């Protein structure tokens, strides 16, 4: 008799779902392909994750949670945070693809996403209170994220015309975040 390891099966299903959603998007992903790749019965997907929507949410939460752990938010060092985020993005294109598909096909946020971004905004609010600056915390976070994601978000044609390698692009992102922070971190009189 073969004893099934539920956690291992669930992990294989999630890993297979990450790949399937990254390469086919939500609409193109097939539960049967996920089950085959995970070497699991299709019914186990429904038992562990509910339905395709919930499985996609689990994939998003895994990607967001993994990024949150791998790239700790440092409001007191936003250029450093931007650099680490840039590095993570450059090294994890599967997660970038999942995020792109999510934006196209399922723009609703998960509760984990909302919680993580609320924590970051609260940390920036604390920094703002401590420094006397008057920036809008959500706007600042959006700008830092946009700069860190910029090189994967621009059209390929534009990226091909830009000078410099990945290290140069990274340095430009850091310099841009430094300039932004310098401009808005000063307390207003």
Spans of model-derived segments:
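Key DNA-contact positions within bacterial/archaeal DNA-binding proteins
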Residues: 43
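Amphipathic alpha-helical segments used for helix-helix packing
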Residues: 89-114, 153-161
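Alpha-helical DNA-contacting segments of helix-turn-helix folds
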Residues: 49, 56-63, 110-113
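C-terminal peripheral helix-coil segments that are non-catalytic and often amphipathic
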Residues: 87, 91, 121-129, 150-189
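Amphipathic alpha-helical packing segments from all-alpha helical-bundle domains
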Residues: 68, 72, 106-139, 171-179
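Amphipathic alpha-helical linker/stalk segments
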Residues: 57-84, 117, 121-125
